[in-house]
């Protein structure tokens, strides 16, 4: 057994030039082979027909300020544990990406000893690999569309495309206008920026809302331990605050918050505290 400290150098991703996975130190500190599934007991599950629309990221690489690429995607715990709770609560999922290309995961964070979570991933593997194209969903949305909620999981991958997607913006506006729930965790709330008005003077539909999310200050610290190979080129918290959103937490903690029908969590460890409302 080695007594040497684990390296804080980001690990090369040989599939792409100048791309990196988190350091061994970061993986040891911030991932776990098992997740906490406490509270996933729903004695009266939903029995209706409405589903959950999960919008995943189809982006693998996020460019850093120093020109390196962070090999990212959706965080598996932030995706699959909320899915597990919702599944236990009686809901099924439609899975979509902006392009219709496969959902990208940060597999280095998969809780590989957690059979309930790896089993759920396997059960939805075909849907993750062959997701719906979001534009096709947008074209069919209406007041009677069969979705109870929109779920946008975290991981750094959503920063690469979702905040700039017209289709994501259209889905979120539909949810707000039709009294449906929006659920998001950690970096997932960056996707709320897709609702940014394109016309001067037009209001931001989420102005006045409060959320919890991964703090910008924490993202600024991650290169110090090699979690990311450089600093982000922008910070979603700053942009949301400028649009009138209040971010309640300043630390990476277990905090969650429900504001009207927007339900958010601050970090990968928030999922067990994410009190899922009746969203039918």
Segments predicted by a language model, with ranges:
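Helix-enriched interaction subdomains in cytosolic or periplasmic regions
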Residues: 2-30
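Catalytic nucleophile loop
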Residues: 149-154, 168-196
């Amino acid at each position: 057994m080695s007594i040497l400290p684990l390296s804080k150098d980001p690990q090369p991703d040989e599939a792409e030039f100048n791309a990196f996975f988190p350091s061994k130190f970061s993986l040891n500190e911030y991932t776990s082979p098992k997740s906490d599934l406490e509270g996933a007991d729903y004695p009266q599950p939903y029995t209706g027909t409405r589903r959950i629309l999960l919008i995943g990221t189809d982006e693998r690489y996020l460019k850093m300020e120093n020109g390196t690429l962070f090999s990212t995607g959706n965080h598996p715990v932030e995706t699959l544990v909320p899915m597990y709770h919702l599944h236990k609560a009686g809901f099924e999922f439609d899975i979509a990406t902006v392009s219709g290309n496969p959902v990208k995961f940060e597999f280095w964070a998969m809780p590989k000893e957690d059979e309930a979570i790896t089993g759920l991933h396997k059960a939805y593997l075909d849907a993750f690999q062959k997701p719906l194209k979001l534009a096709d969903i947008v074209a069919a949305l209406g007041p009677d569309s069969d979705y109870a909620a929109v779920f946008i999981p975290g991981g750094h991958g959503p920063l690469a495309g979702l905040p700039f997607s017209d289709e994501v913006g259209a889905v979120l506006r539909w949810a707000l206008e039709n009294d449906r729930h929006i659920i998001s965790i950690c970096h997932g709330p960056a996707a709320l920026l897709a609702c940014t008005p394109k016309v001067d003077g037009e209001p931001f539909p989420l102005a006045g809302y409060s959320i919890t999310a991964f703090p910008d200050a924490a993202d600024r610290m991650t290169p110090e331990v090699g979690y990311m190979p450089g600093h982000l080129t922008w910070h979603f918290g700053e942009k949301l605050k400028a649009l009138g959103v209040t971010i309640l937490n300043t630390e990476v903690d277990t905090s969650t918050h429900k504001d009207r029908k927007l339900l958010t969590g601050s970090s990968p460890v928030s999922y067990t505290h994410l009190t899922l409302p009746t969203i039918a």
